[in-house]
Amino acid sequence: MRLGHISDFHLRYHLAGTSTVLARKSRDMPEKINLAIKRFREEKVDCVVVTGDIVDHPFEDMNIPEYLEKGEADLLLVRDLLDQLDCPVFVVYGNHDHPLLFRRVFSLREESSIVGDFRIHCFYDEEGRNNTPERVGGELERFFEATSNSDEYSQIHIQHYLLYPEKNDGYPHTYLNSTSLIKSASSFGKVTLALSGHFHPGENLVQYQGIYFAVAPAFCEPPHPFRIYDLSRPIIQTQHLNLS
């Protein structure tokens, strides 16, 4: 199976302005996303994963009517772009997305999906105290249920935040309970690959406790990188792509 991975658009088109971080080219995103989708189609990937921060929704006064209307319009724009793909697309929200608007536009994949030889699980987590992400409640229950599944499918787990490695200097990117999550996942041996975004420099594919972990670099920042993973071999291969 060939899996496309792209993350952190921080798009603004209907929403005014741009990200407060000038390196994030929020207003260029519709054109750039379209180019990445074209490449995914050319590469004939079997599915595409988008690991959050679809839109750069304003944090302050995030629920005022104007921001809600334009934020939803921007999510719809991204959905329309992704609809050009002729393969399954898995999207989770990030800390810069409005969770309720995301649910309205994309809905949540709370049931797993099978693509090829893999069962794909999406997890929708939140930041907690001091902006530290944590998997709790229903998402934690779904995680434990997934990792203890005894069927024949290997699993791919999709989330915005990092399970591994620990990247918390300057800003907390890694789950507060990452150690226990990895321990649970590795003990049952069901999880082959865990994909994340959030940490803009990204992290290359690495194997730890029997699981492959990868963090996509932010697509919103030049050279607008994205990846394709080839899972057809025992050792997963990464193809690094960008728009430069």
Positions of the model-derived regions?
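Active-site environment of divalent metal-dependent phosphoester hydrolases
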Residues: H10-G17, D56-F59, N95-F102, G128-N131, ...
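Short, flexible/disordered intra-domain loops and linkers
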Residues: G17-S26, E60-G71, K167-H173
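Core catalytic region of metal-dependent phosphoesterases/phosphodiesterases
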Residues: D28-V115
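His/acidic metal-ligating clusters that form di-metal
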Residues: A36-V48, R119, T132-Y212
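Binuclear metal-dependent phosphoesterase catalytic core
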Residues: S184, G202-S244
